[in-house]
Design a protein with these regions (language model features):
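An acidic/histidine-cluster motif and surrounding catalytic segment
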Residues: 1-92, 96-128
């Protein structure tokens, strides 16, 4: 059984200098037969460049690292949405590991069928 059948396109965040993490996540994609993925350069809104883009956010509310992730993810979502490439998108970071998929008692299509009819966004994981 291919538990990831029906998986939407994936966009993953990766800093330009973290080629090790790029290799890790693309190795995961290869292992699981995932071919529809796009790398998003998280260096665009890196903390090192916060003086260039930090004025767009209230940095009193966010740590620079969190602000960087927010800006990269929002910009990525906007670009994806405006492209019309697909109805759904899976956004991940480059340190994700799919190893637990083999233990799922369900598959991706079951997840999609189980969502409420009017869902707009689903967060599967949060690391604090």
């Amino acid at each position: 059984m291919n538990k990831l059948k029906g998986l939407p396109p994936i966009m993953y965040l990766n800093l330009d200098h973290r080629t090790d993490r790029k290799e890790h996540i693309e190795g995961q994609f290869k292992k699981w037969g995932i071919t529809d993925f796009t790398r998003w350069s998280a260096s665009r809104f890196s903390t090192k460049k916060i003086d260039e883009w930090g004025h767009k956010l209230d940095l009193m509310l966010l740590a620079p690292s969190d602000a960087s992730i927010v800006m990269n993810e929002f910009t990525m979502m906007i670009e994806w949405y405006e492209s019309g490439i697909s109805e759904n998108l899976l956004i991940i970071q480059d340190d994700l590991c799919f190893d637990l998929v083999e233990y799922w008692p369900f598959d991706w299509e079951t997840i999609m069928k189980s969502l409420p009819y009017n869902w707009e966004i689903v967060q599967f994981y949060h690391c604090h």
